[in-house]
UniProtKB/Swiss-Prot annotation:
Protein name: Probable bZIP transcription factor
Keyword rRNA processing belongs to the record: no
Subcellular location: Nucleus
Family: Belongs to the bZIP family.
Record has DNA-binding as a keyword: yes
Alphabetical keyword list: DNA-binding, Nucleus, Transcription, Transcription regulation
Gene Ontology cellular component annotations, sorted alphabetically: nucleus
Top-level division of the source organism's lineage: Eukaryota
Annotated region (Basic motif), positions in chain: 1-19
Transmembrane segments: none
Span of domain bZIP: 1-19
GO molecular function, one term: DNA binding
Length: 19
């Protein structure tokens, strides 16, 4: 089970775009 917060999801999205 992963409890990712909305803010954490957005942060990962930005890192993915940078990569």
């Amino acid at each position: 089970k992963r409890m990712l917060s909305n803010r954490e999801s957005a942060r990962r999205s930005r890192m993915r775009k940078q990569k």
